[in-house]
C-alpha cells in the first residue's frame, strides 16, 4: 500500500508540475506579447499561485493586473495602461479557462485515477471543513485514503467503485 501511495502521489505532483508549466508558458506568452517588464517572473508567480484552489487564480489576476500597470508607469493611463491591462486580463481569463476545462481535468483524472467531479467535490468539501489548507491538501490526502481503503476494505462495494482504476 505504501508503494501504491507513493506512485499515485508522484503522479499527482508530476501532474501539478505539468499544469504549472502549461500556465507558466501561456502567461509568459501573454505578458511578452504586451511588453510587460519582468514577464517571466510574473508568469511564474501567477502559475504558482494557481496551486491554491479557487483563491490562487483570483490572487494571480490581481497580481498580474497590478504588475502590468506598474510596468507602464509614466505612460498615458487611458491610452496605454488601461488597454494593455485589459488585454492581459483577457489573456489571463483565457488561460484559466484552458486550465480549468482542458488541462486540469485531464491531468488530474489521469494522474490520480479519479473523475474530475470527484476531485471537485473533495476539494470543495475540504475547503468548507478546513479552509485553504484543506483545499491544498485535499487531493494528496484523498489519494492516500483511496489506497488505504483499497488495501484494507477491498470487499466493500463502494470502495471497489472508488478504487477500480488504482
Task: For each feature predicted by the language model, list its residue ranges.
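Short alpha-helix boundary/capping motifs
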Residues: 16, 37, 58-59, 76, ...
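Intrinsically disordered, low-complexity Ser/Thr- and acidic-rich flexible linkers and loops
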Residues: 74-80
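Structural signal for the C-terminal ends of transmembrane alpha-helices
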Residues: 69-70, 149
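Hydrophobic alpha-helical transmembrane segments of membrane transport and translocation systems
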Residues: 81-166
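Alpha-helical transmembrane segments and their immediate interhelical loop/hinge regions
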Residues: 1-69, 78
Amino acid at each position: 500500500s505504501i508503494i501504491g501511495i507513493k506512485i499515485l502521489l508522484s503522479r499527482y505532483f508530476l501532474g501539478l508540475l505539468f499544469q504549472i508549466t502549461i500556465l507558466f508558458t501561456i502567461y509568459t506568452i501573454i505578458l511578452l506579447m504586451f511588453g510587460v517588464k519582468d514577464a517571466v517572473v510574473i508568469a511564474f508567480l501567477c502559475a504558482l499561485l494557481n496551486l491554491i484552489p479557487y483563491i490562487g487564480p483570483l490572487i494571480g489576476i490581481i497580481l498580474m493586473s497590478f504588475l502590468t500597470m506598474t510596468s507602464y508607469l509614466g505612460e498615458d493611463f487611458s491610452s496605454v495602461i488601461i488597454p494593455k491591462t485589459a488585454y492581459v486580463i483577457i489573456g489571463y481569463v483565457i488561460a484559466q479557462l484552458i486550465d480549468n476545462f482542458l488541462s486540469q481535468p485531464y491531468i488530474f483524472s489521469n494522474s490520480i485515477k479519479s473523475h474530475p467531479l470527484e476531485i471537485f467535490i473533495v476539494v470543495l468539501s475540504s475547503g468548507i471543513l478546513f479552509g485553504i489548507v484543506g483545499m491544498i491538501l485535499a487531493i494528496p490526502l484523498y489519494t492516500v485514503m483511496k489506497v488505504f481503503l483499497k488495501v484494507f476494505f477491498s470487499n466493500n462495494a463502494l470502495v471497489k467503485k472508488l478504487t477500480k482504476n488504482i
